[in-house]
Amino acid sequence: EKVYGMSKPYINNSQLIVVPKDSDIKTLADLKGRIVAVQDDSTGSYLLEQPANKDLAAGLKEIRKYPDFAAIYMELDNKRVDAAIVDAVLARGYYDKKKPDTYRILDENMGDEVVAIAFRKDDKEFRERIDKAMDEMKKDGTCKKISEKWMGADITVYDK
């Protein structure tokens, strides 16, 4: 927010752990000694570098960083990694829709976040127009319908 203007948050997101369906990994603790994939410069990658996750990261056999989401799936498909840390938005849209019988998402996650749109700091009028449109879409149920269609659940952020 120091460099960009931000819209109101519009999506709730989490960093999920995805494993092959037949994996014996059930919890974050089970990742010890395993190879974990993350997208480079992603929230998942960032979280593994934080002091709160120091012990988890130190216990991993290896953290492999990939340039994009597709490369991570390829590594999971070919069993070159044991697990992946990915955005819930991406995981729900891909794993749940395209490969529901291939992967499993752990109950535990690496953390929650909200998603917003970044704007040029001096573009306040455009940001306000986007916020207004998003508020209207939340109010009339459009955001909920889109979210349920593509994510399988309503992950919209609503004002309290």
Language model segments and positions:
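Periplasmic-binding protein-like
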Residues: 11-19, 88, 92-135, 153-160
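Beta->alpha turn/N-cap motifs
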Residues: 13, 21, 39-42, 68-69, ...
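Ligand-binding cleft/hinge of the Venus flytrap
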Residues: 44-65, 95-100
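Structural recognition of the beta-strand scaffold that forms the well-ordered cores
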Residues: 16-18, 36-39, 64-65, 83-86, ...
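Acidic, polar ligand-binding/catalytic clefts
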Residues: 1-30, 109
